[in-house]
Amino acid sequence: MTLIHPTAVIDPKAELDSSVKVGAYTVIGPNVQIGANTEIGPHAVINGHTSIGENNRIFQFASLGEIPQDKKYRDEPTRLIIGNGNTIREFTTFNLGTVTGIGETRIGDDNWIMAYCHLAHDCVVGNHTIFANNASLAGHVTIGDYVVLGGYTLVFQFCRIGDYAMTAFAAGVHKDVPPYFMASGYRAEPAGLNSEGMRRNGFTAEQISAVKDVYKTLYHRGIPFEEAKADILRRAETQAELAVFRDFFAQSARGIIR
C-alpha cells in the first residue's frame, strides 16, 4: 500500500520513516524529520528545521515549522521539536524558535491540541496537555505537564503555567499560574483548585487537601507573598506533591496571578 499520496510535495532531503503516512497536497520541506507511524493529513505544511517524533497524528491544514512572527527574525536555522504520540488538529500553527529566545519551540509527548491553536516562537509545552480550540500562546511561554487550556485562552509572552493547572474559557493569562490551580477571566485571576483534574490523575484526598492549603496560604490568609512562598517551600521539603512549587517559584518571571 502506498503511504504517500501522489499529490504530496516532499523535498528529497526530508527524512521520513518508511511507515509515515502523508495525505493529498501536503507539503514537506527539506529540513524536516518525521518518525515512525506518524500520520499527516491532506493540505498540511511542514517546513523549517522541524523534528517530529513517532505515533503523531497531524490533521489537515496544520502549519508546522514556519518562521516566527517576530520582526527580528533573520532566517536563522532555529527549530521546532515535536515529541511522540501527539494529536494536532486542523489549522494549528506552530512556529520555529528565535535566536533571541531558546532557539527552538518544543512540544513534548501525548498532547491533545485542538483546532486553530497557535504556539508562537520559543514556547515549551510539556506532556499530556489538552489545548481546547483556539487556545493561543504568545512567544516564550512555558506550559507544564497535564495542563488544560480552555477554548480561546490567550497566554501573554513569557508566562508560565504550572503542572496540572487549568484555565477557563477565554481566559487572558497575563501572569504565571501556579501548579494545580485554576485561572479564569479576561485578566485571569485565581479560580480555585483543579481538584477534579488531580483526582483523575491519581492524587489522593490527602494530597489534594495539602495543595488546597497552599491555595489558601497564597490567597486567603492575608499573608505577604514572600512569607507565604517561604512557608510553601518549607512544606515542599516533606510533601512530594508540593515539590513542583520549588521549580515554579524559582522560574517564575512575571509573578503569579492574584
Curated annotation (Swiss-Prot):
Pathway annotation: Glycolipid biosynthesis; lipid IV(A) biosynthesis; lipid IV(A) from (3R)-3-hydroxytetradecanoyl-[acyl-carrier-protein] and UDP-N-acetyl-alpha-D-glucosamine: step 1/6
Q: Can you tell which superkingdom this protein's organism belongs to?
A: Bacteria
Q: Which CDD domains match?
A: LbH_UDP-GlcNAc_AT
- GO-annotated biological processes: lipid A biosynthetic process
Keyword annotations for this protein, in alphabetical order, are: Acyltransferase, Cytoplasm, Lipid A biosynthesis, Lipid biosynthesis, Lipid metabolism, Repeat, Transferase
- Which Gene Ontology molecular function entries are recorded, alphabetically? acyl-[acyl-carrier-protein]-UDP-N-acetylglucosamine O-acyltransferase activity
Q: In the UniProt record, does the keyword Transmembrane helix occur?
A: no
Q: What class of enzyme is it?
A: transferase
Gene Ontology cellular component list: cytoplasm; membrane
Q: What PANTHER family is this protein classified in?
A: ACYL-[ACYL-CARRIER-PROTEIN]--UDP-N-ACETYLGLUCOSAMINE O-ACYLTRANSFERASE (PTHR43480), ACYL-[ACYL-CARRIER-PROTEIN]--UDP-N-ACETYLGLUCOSAMINE O-ACYLTRANSFERASE, MITOCHONDRIAL-RELATED (PTHR43480:SF1)
The family note in this entry says:
Belongs to the transferase hexapeptide repeat family. LpxA subfamily.
Know the name of this protein? Acyl-[acyl-carrier-protein]--UDP-N-acetylglucosamine O-acyltransferase
Q: Which organism is it from?
A: Neisseria meningitidis serogroup C (strain 053442)
